[in-house]
Regions:
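Membrane-interfacial terminal anchoring regions of lipid-handling membrane enzymes
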Residues: 1-255
C-alpha cells in the first residue's frame, strides 16, 4: 500500500515521480488495488469513476510494463455504516465535519454496536488488451513517462472505467438490509404491518432470485420473517405492538 495526494494539479514533479513509481510496480507484475470511485458512496449508487490512477496504469502498460493487465471489479456492500448518521446529515446540507480527537473517541464507542456483515463479490474481469484492441489502441507504444496518452488511449481509459463500474454493479449483493430498506423506505411513515412487511420481503426476494439483474448478483437466502428478525438484531428496525397487529418500523436516527 502507498498513499498519494488527493489532487495532482500543479505538481508536475510529484506526478512524474508517481507515474514512474507505478510503472516500476507494474513491471514487477505486482498486484495493485485502487478504488475508481475515489470514496464511499453516500447513497448506495455508484459514483462517477475517477480515472487518474487508471490512466497511469494504462500509460505504464503502453510503455511495456509487465504482463497483460486484467482488472477485477470488486463489489463491497455494507449492511450498516458507522458513519450512517453523519452521511444523512451531509446529504441534508450540513457541512462535512473535520476529523478530531473527540470524533475518534465517539467512533471507538460505536465499536460495541452490531454492524452486521460486509459483503464482497467479484464481477467479470476486464482485460485491458481487449479494450485497447476495440478502440484501435493496441498498436500504441510509449517510450517515456513524459509522453501523453494519445486520443485512442484516452478513449480506452474511459471505456475500461465504464466497464469496471458496470461489472461492479452486476456483481451486487442483495442483503437483508437492502430488502428491508426497499420495503420500509417506500412507505409514507417508514412503517408497515408486520404480516404485510413479510409478504413484501418474500415477494421482492423471489423477484430478485427468479429474474436476476445478472447471473453474478447474489440474493440473501433469508425468508421475510428471518429478515425482520435480523433487522431487529442489528437494531435497524423496531417492532411496535398494536392490538390490530404488530408494526415494523425503522429505528429512530438511522442513516
Amino acid at each position: 500500500a502507498f498513499f498519494i495526494r488527493r489532487s495532482l494539479k500543479g505538481l508536475p514533479l510529484y506526478t512524474t515521480v508517481l507515474n514512474e513509481y507505478l510503472y516500476s510496480i507494474l513491471v514487477r507484475n505486482t498486484p495493485l488495488e485502487y478504488f475508481l470511485e475515489g470514496g464511499r458512496s453516500r447513497t448506495g449508487r455508484l459514483l462517477r469513476p475517477k480515472t487518474g490512477m487508471l490512466a497511469m496504469t494504462v500509460h505504464s502498460k503502453l510503455r511495456g510494463g509487465g504482463k497483460p493487465a486484467v482488472f477485477i471489479p470488486t463489489y463491497f456492500g455494507y449492511e450498516r455504516l458507522m458513519e450512517g448518521a453523519t452521511y444523512v446529515g451531509e446529504m441534508s446540507g450540513k457541512p462535512k465535519e473535520a476529523e478530531s480527537i473527540f470524533g475518534l473517541i465517539q467512533a471507538a464507542r460505536k465499536i460495541e454496536r452490531i454492524f452486521g456483515k460486509v459483503h464482497v463479490n467479484f464481477g467479470e474481469p476486464v482485460f485491458l488488451d481487449d479494450v485497447l484492441k476495440a478502440h484501435n489502441a493496441d498498436h500504441i507504444r510509449l517510450n517515456s513517462n513524459e509522453q501523453p496518452l494519445p486520443p485512442e488511449a484516452v478513449n480506452t481509459v474511459n471505456a475500461v472505467a465504464q466497464n469496471i463500474m458496470q461489472n461492479i454493479n452486476r456483481a451486487a449483493i442483495i442483503n437483508p438490509v437492502s430488502l428491508l430498506s426497499l420495503v420500509l423506505l417506500s412507505t409514507p411513515k417508514h412503517a408497515l404491518d408486520e404480516d404485510v412487511c413479510i409478504k413484501q420481503l418474500d415477494a421482492y426476494r423471489r423477484l430478485a432470485t427468479n429474474a436476476p439483474y445478472d447471473e453474478r448478483v447474489d440474493v440473501t437466502p433469508l425468508a421475510g420473517k428471518e429478515i425482520i428478525a435480523y433487522g431487529l438484531k442489528l437494531k435497524l428496525i423496531k417492532r411496535v405492538k398494536h392490538v390490530l397487529g404488530d408494526i415494523i418500523a425503522i429505528e429512530d436516527n438511522q442513516g
